Amino acid sequence: MTSSVIPPSPSAADYAAEGDRPLVPETDNPIGLFQDWMAQARASEPNDSNAMSLATVDADGRPDVRIVLLKGVDSEGFTFFTNLESVKGVQLAANPVAALCFHWKSQRRQVRVRGGVAPVSAAEADAYFASRAAQSRISAIASDQSRPLADRAIFEQRVAEISSVYGDDNDIPRPPHWGGFRLVPTEIEFWQDQAFRMHDRLRFYRKADGGWATVRLYP
């Protein structure tokens, strides 16, 4: 079945015009490789190079996925923030495992991550919340994220009321229903597009001693 809205598969001429792409480099530091790829994506993506799909599961084992923004990555893991009473917040509290997927079209690259999830400290959540624009903080306070909204005007009125409370005061505290999570990776897979679907895949998986092992995968 075909559709006019779906682009056709690349032709041999299309692949020839694009040229060769590098393979995923061998390394014992997948976090460092991810940071390198993120830096390259930031320089080439039109916006939100830190956007990622976050997959969770509900109490019945049904999957959910949505786009969120990565706000930190280091040897401890991948950090993001959210309303803790949102669907994802509730699901992560009940079943603290998740998967991430980054797709950078400009680089023809993808990174998949799986692992356990833990809340960040209150101090870390406070620090990030304070770094946000004042109006974004007010919006976070006002939002009952994922719950039914009878009329957008209700939300806008709530934002206006909270804004009037703080006025020009930039000291807007983090509400208790807002915080962050850190995904501690057990698997990280790097994918690089190659001609004729001969894509390159390198998977890192955590060893018992805390180090990383690698395996290349068929595309």
From Swiss-Prot:
The keyword Oxidoreductase applies. InterPro entries: Pyridox_Oxase, Pyridox_Oxase_CS, Pyridox_Oxase_N, Pyridoxamine_oxidase_dimer_C, Split_barrel_FMN-bd. One of its GO terms (molecular function) is FMN binding. Pfam families: PNP_phzG_C, PNPOx_N. FMN binds at R66, I67, V68, L69, L70, K71, F81, T82, K88, Q110, Q145, S146, W191, R201. Binds 1 FMN per subunit. It catalyses: pyridoxamine 5'-phosphate + O2 + H2O = pyridoxal 5'-phosphate + H2O2 + NH4(+); pyridoxine 5'-phosphate + O2 = pyridoxal 5'-phosphate + H2O2. One of its GO terms (biological process) is pyridoxine biosynthetic process. Keywords: Flavoprotein, FMN, Oxidoreductase, Pyridoxine biosynthesis. Pathway: Cofactor metabolism; pyridoxal 5'-phosphate salvage; pyridoxal 5'-phosphate from pyridoxamine 5'-phosphate: step 1/1; Cofactor metabolism; pyridoxal 5'-phosphate salvage; pyridoxal 5'-phosphate from pyridoxine 5'-phosphate: step 1/1. Its cofactor is FMN. It comes from the Bacteria. Homodimer. Catalyzes the oxidation of either pyridoxine 5'-phosphate (PNP) or pyridoxamine 5'-phosphate (PMP) into pyridoxal 5'-phosphate (PLP). Belongs to the pyridoxamine 5'-phosphate oxidase family. This is Pyridoxine/pyridoxamine 5'-phosphate oxidase.
